[in-house]
């Protein structure tokens, strides 16, 4: 969709950018402060700080900009420690992006504009939001400012005009051809990868593709037998719960004919095609056993268990953990189950609903997996009871659950949507999601009332909605794709775990004396955090040095240890949604490349 250029807005933005660049060149803190609104926020994605960081408030933002992005000229607030190499120059509206426009963000009107600039080492992009009304003196002030690295000068992605020529294998008829070279590259018979990516899901593929395009030698290892099996092996009816336009992988978008909600097997097959098309190095049936870091050499010694049972040691400089927000199954000790005579499995082990046709199944846990498994079992003829342990947020998959992705339906390029998504600082993201949570509750008022009447406990304590539940705990919500309706209609039973006194050989004994029969109990009890996996694979010392992974660091206003250096050199993490991994894989890859070429020690 083409958006007409509003020349008045463009003039406002151009004047602000010129004043901003001039104030930084002069290291003039007073002039900078005049450009910022009292409620201002600056988020930097490597462009000026080589970090992912957010700063809020006029004086903190001024101080940070002077520290990282000011020139060395004398001026009001001149900072002798300023780094002229990071000073933005050539700040102009990016004519290749969505033109400046008036929009609503976090419930407030603003002027939103994409711009581009350079530093000594980087080409970069930015997103500016100005309050729509001019302040005293007629100058518009910045509400939010995003600065984000795009590419390292001299080390650009090998795409387009920089694509490989192919001469080495197309004109040397007696030498190895393309396939020979690919096989040798994947084998690592005589060298180690620069980067080892652990996990071949969307997170691992995203970072490996980014690094491949930066000419960084990267190997993905995954314990599954086939690329995509992390999706292919899940329960039969699974589809993605957000829409196709949000879920593209880097460089290779899904075809325009694909369904809105992608089936698991279709996605799994796409993963295989993606690896082949982008020439990603991938070892299947390979388990990452653990790793030790050598501070003297700056390399890891990682142990891999191969398909034939043998071990292989590799020595990469970087290990990227791409095993997901949820890694190790959380199997709680439930004493009441000790006397149960039937089968018990964790939701991660659940595969085949048809095997339980006509039989009684109890699913413990009311998050997404619990609901989906209950619905899958019911659809295949099982008699299902869902057991709730704690209050759960429920939203209809359409339209309420899709509200956080509304920007991807504004008719603008995915790249622009990604920049907008990355530009909201934590405070405004919370405000935005609080408003969306209220809107979703209004949309789903009837569903919530019906579930409450059936005895389902709705989580109303968290006012920021499902996405902040994901960012803080990785779950605790359900997108209703039909199971809630089955509960309301009485087709799927509902019990509270607190009402279960004990289990016997036949099922659950309730405190009131009733019996709920069960041949199978599925524990949809979630997963342990990545901290547990780090401790298991790398040991206590490295886990302690690394620190907590995932969840929000309130002081920094960022996710903890995601997409950026951790306390352990050479250990990185990437996780989250398809959109998060598409967006932040770029910045993780740039940080690794900058270290490889010596821009960062």
Q: What are the language-model segments listed below?
A:
Residues 12, 22, 26-79, 83-107:
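A solvent-exposed, acidic/Ser-Thr-rich amphipathic alpha-helical stretch
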Residues 148, 160, 216, 221-223, ...:
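Flavin (primarily FAD) cofactor-binding/catalytic cores of flavoenzymes
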Residues 168-193, 345-357:
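A short, basic/flexible loop-to-alpha-helix module at the beginning of a structural domain
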Residues 187-220, 369-378:
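N-terminal Rossmann-like FAD-binding beta1-loop-alpha1 element of flavoenzymes
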